Amino acid sequence: MDNPSIITQVTNPKEEEILSCTQDKVSQCNISLKKQRSRSIFSTLFCCFRDYNVEPPSTNSTSALPPLVEENGGLQKGDQMQVMPIPSPPAKYLLPELTASDYGKKCVVIDLDETLVHSSFKPISNADFIVPVEIDGTIHQVYVLKRPHVDEFLQRMGELFECVLFTASLAKYADPVADLLDRWGVFRARLFRESCVFHRGNYVKDLSRLGRELSKVIIVDNSPASYIFHPENAVPVQSWFDDMTDTELLDLIPFFEGLSKEEEVYSMLHKLCNR
């Protein structure tokens, strides 16, 4: 779309059918994860051609108010199950040097929208936060729902890992939401849309640009397109919108407690999806 939206989300399945073909390909991983948890992780491993002639998102404004939803998650028809080599590391990394308190810990990159929270410009009666966002000189209220058990999840993750918030949404929305959500200072860094790579219509989180050893990096995200460059590092989760009985984040804690003790992440993630 010509005018980038404020919030990057996947489509709510209540409103339209989504990615049914893609979901079929990941059922095997979901089955193995169900053996460890009562609810499945929406698990996917993708490989694709990588285009290094990246086009930046257009900034031409053609409408007064950007739409709420910038969809991120659909893969283009040309994205076949093949892998291209990762390019040389960038001269400047996205993350600062590791602090002494995080030395020896793995880095967990955590998505925001539909992973930890769900946000809407439409009023939500039970919203946990209401965040004012300025768009074209007008203040709009964004209503934010916290995913069940997000507090317990973040607190435990902060104890086990170097945690980084990485969202394809804009900082003007995501930063104040993170201020309200992360009361414990779990996130050592926050990365927003400008830190993503715009690839074939999606905002991709290129983990090679973080400045961390990839064998010790995990990404937690509901959108397969977000980690399409590094699917072997992903712990996918189901998109969350408003189900207050959801326990996915709570169910993930034991898995991450085990993963934190591993020398590298690939073996455990590979075994998990190949049982």
Curated annotation (Swiss-Prot):
A GO-annotated cellular component: nucleus
UniProt-listed SMART domains: CPDc (SM00577)
Listed Gene3D superfamilies: HAD superfamily/HAD-like (3.40.50.1000)
Reactions that this protein is recorded to catalyse: O-phospho-L-seryl-[protein] + H2O = L-seryl-[protein] + phosphate; O-phospho-L-threonyl-[protein] + H2O = L-threonyl-[protein] + phosphate
Subcellular location: Nucleus
Cofactor note: Binds 1 Mg(2+) ion per monomer.
Pfam families: NIF
EC number, as in UniProt: 3.1.3.16
Active site: 111 (4-aspartylphosphate intermediate), 113 (proton donor)
CDD domains: HAD_FCP1-like
Gene Ontology molecular function terms on file: metal ion binding; RNA polymerase II CTD heptapeptide repeat phosphatase activity
Names of the cofactor(s): Mg(2+)
Entry keyword annotation includes Amino-acid biosynthesis: no
Swiss-Prot/TrEMBL site (Transition state stabilizer) positions: 167, 205
Domain FCP1 homology stretches: 101-259
Residues that, per the record, bind Mg(2+): 111, 113, 222
UniProt keyword terms in alphabetical order: Hydrolase, Magnesium, Metal-binding, Nucleus, Protein phosphatase
Principal place of residence: nucleus
Oligomer and partners: Monomer. Interacts with LDB1.
Role: Preferentially catalyzes the dephosphorylation of 'Ser-5' within the tandem 7 residue repeats in the C-terminal domain (CTD) of the largest RNA polymerase II subunit POLR2A. Negatively regulates RNA polymerase II transcription, possibly by controlling the transition from initiation/capping to processive transcript elongation. Recruited by REST to neuronal genes that contain RE-1 elements, leading to neuronal gene silencing in non-neuronal cells.
Name of the protein: CTD small phosphatase-like protein
Gene field: NFI1
